[in-house]
């Protein structure tokens, strides 16, 4: 029975259906779009085929079917606040799709779609309706699709014509576009409709209510728009792009009114219910739905290499995770760290369909555990700070919390702005979101989301790629340092020109080149291009790939003239290339060694392969110990000494993955890939240049290991001569230190320890002398004490600028005053320092040094705190220190009269 089909069975049935009809089953691409700076996340099945549809990429198949991982959260698809409170909104979902690249068109697409929903899924034709484009804006209505649907047996009364908004699709302002048809399923007229609630008529398939549920969209790419608002030009080979949300289809097949009632979510919701001890219900389970939905998004995003952070994709992930954690802690009462347990259930349930979840399980769970632990601390600090700010605002009679405060909470403490808004509203206060968004924009302008491309893709390069195709790379064969090619294009200041003469700085595009264009972290080559028998010479300063497959040479013409069509000799700086090869191969070995030493969860998070160093970013939470780094070095150097022959094989992407080759995060691979084995221990997909034998690397030395973001570590390392020079420099420094300490290198550490101990002893003695000198006149200071409400209060500024000296003075004056409060102020580098100390008897009467110093700190523009008997504060405005100290008397008086 159709109702018995699970979501997994529906997914497999869809893919198998189209496989049997000549479609290639293609694996889901990453949620991080490769080489597409326009998208934050993959949000549709066609994303991985965008270049195929535009003709920039060709594949060895013309029909494809996929189950694509998608995330819609952030940008124009930001429905995050609705997730959990509606039946359909999700952050993560699966898009089933079938695609034709200039092969079949409307007739087959419509026939396939109708056959699958009515025969394979067994949906009743009486509950199905279809929409077609009605014609608008000068574009004719889709009569062809209308007639084809009728041919399938769809009656005219269930064929609806809708406009551009609903039934016309475009990739952007320019590019492929065309009408579309949507298949809708009737769930029942008893479902509430907003239109009817307002006294209007339900709009049926065009209504936003759920009576008619869209389950499949078939896009007919039959036009192309060359320029914005330009005419639609018929494509010579129209294509098909369809998308069906698995969650929606599962709800229909399983007879559920909500996606959350399907088996995709019920098992996850059961885990949430078990953790919080509250039974799930559709009516009261909003917070449980939030946790269930967000756990799916977190699992898939982290497994695809996204890390929680305060910018770009990482910030969207952080917001998703923290929203789930907040609902778990505040609404569901989950006191212990819980989110990673829900995510683990997601991995268990979906790991068969998406093996990458299981492969990265350890790391995914650690990221979730770490983020929740951190956020729980943030939540506590943030709640305390916002409480202070709101109390101050209400005391002053204010009605709106400043957007600057919201930004401070958001940026400094990672506190969600929407939570700040909720808390403010509970107090009857508004939030200045306009100012908050201004601050966000200012921050975004400083660090704009750059996408996954290394350089901005200029229109000129897109046009060149369309016209010229890919550049043939000669660098893999032989030494790969030299080659002959023809100049296909010359670009100057972003525009094509026909020639370049002496003194010009331009970019050359050749049909064939030995120059490696920067990609995959490997820097571009440098060298020379010579033409006209040596009469024209250009220095190549860089080689880039602004568009996949197109190599652009940045050159400075030093002699003669180069023209489009000239044959030239291109020569790479061979020594520089040799160093890059060594560093690139060493990067592969380093990656493998890190996995062996730190764990299989280690994933590359970025790299730079330069001639003089290599930099490798990887997913790992804690700093690697010295012993671990030594172990990594030993492994890599051992593999280098093995002098194993490096091997490069060309195979299909599918075969490469089956062979166990490691794919790099963020890289886009074609159907045919290069698989590089530097040593039997290391096999990776890679298009870069490498050594012939592992021994060619020479020597490997780690120069540094550090953290660059939460859960991301960075290693900088050197190879060959560079590594040797690094070791020698360290030796020279060690000898210098030994000479200064009048020791030998082996005894340096002992001598340094002894010296440090001596320095600390001297510092202690100096501090004692300073305190004695400052307190020698304490008798005079005590005479300045005032009587406030029967207790002695002293606030004074001294010349001491050391925290410890001020603390010592405060201690001594408190002892001498016997009963009362003392405040000592000092200045250091223009900043104010304030120490407040209170005797035990006045603390018992309600005096609190921490509360006093917090109020005093506001005068100097700072903050402070501490215990009831001793507290400290600091602030940037030392000029207001006298006013801050004077405020103590007023504050104590207020306590005494309270």
Swiss-Prot record:
Binds 1 zinc ion per subunit. One of its GO terms (cellular component) is cytosol. It is found in: Cytoplasm. It is an enzyme of class 6 (ligase). One of its GO terms (biological process) is negative regulation of DNA-templated transcription. It comes from the Bacteria. Its main location: cytoplasm. Keywords: Aminoacyl-tRNA synthetase, ATP-binding, Cytoplasm, Ligase, Metal-binding, Nucleotide-binding, Protein biosynthesis, RNA-binding, tRNA-binding, Zinc. It catalyses: tRNA(Ala) + L-alanine + ATP = L-alanyl-tRNA(Ala) + AMP + diphosphate. Coiled coil: none annotated. Its cofactor is Zn(2+). InterPro entries: aa-tRNA-synth_II/BPL/LPL, Ala-tRNA-lgiase_IIc, Ala-tRNA-ligase_IIc_anticod-bd, Ala-tRNA-synth_IIc_core, Ala-tRNA-synth_IIc_N, Ala-tRNA_ligase, Ala_tRNA_ligase_euk/bac, DHHA1_dom. GO terms for molecular function: alanine-tRNA ligase activity; aminoacyl-tRNA deacylase activity; ATP binding; tRNA binding; zinc ion binding. Its EC number is 6.1.1.7. CDD domains: AlaRS_core (cd00673). Zn(2+) binds at residues 584, 588, 686, 690. Consists of three domains; the N-terminal catalytic domain, the editing domain and the C-terminal C-Ala domain. The editing domain removes incorrectly charged amino acids, while the C-Ala domain, along with tRNA(Ala), serves as a bridge to cooperatively bring together the editing and aminoacylation centers thus stimulating deacylation of misacylated tRNAs. PANTHER family: ALANINE--TRNA LIGASE, CYTOPLASMIC, ALANYL-TRNA SYNTHETASE. Belongs to the class-II aminoacyl-tRNA synthetase family. Catalyzes the attachment of alanine to tRNA(Ala) in a two-step reaction: alanine is first activated by ATP to form Ala-AMP and then transferred to the acceptor end of tRNA(Ala). Also edits incorrectly charged Ser-tRNA(Ala) and Gly-tRNA(Ala) via its editing domain. This is Alanine--tRNA ligase. It comes from Myxococcus xanthus (strain DK1622). The gene is alaS.
